[in-house]
């Protein structure tokens, strides 16, 4: 599993070099970090105010992120220097912060530390879903583990 994660991190770093400017803004520190929502075919998910999809890392423990070092180049932590704010369907009562390395505050939602994915682009905004244990979150704070819709039964009788 660790080797798989390292390979994915390396692949993500390569993709980062090509796609980092895609959103024109990273998920770095902001005095008024805003968490909002956006609708996709698999549900309403959390995004930044600039539209970047937010993810949780299933391997995180409260206050102890599993993603460190090079992993953070691929999965940047959503940081804040002030109190995070909710917009859209996001709930202010579920927002919080966790102190990470260097005393930096990482935004949390329903206890989950939030990350963006460096390889997401405007044309593929949820490409990190399911990679290495990272998942998008619903407005209730639940992880969404599948972004594919189930096909409807055929009406042709076959």
Regions found by a protein language model. Give the residues of each.
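Compact beta-sheet-dominated domain cores in extracellular/mature segments
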Residues: 2-9, 16, 21-158
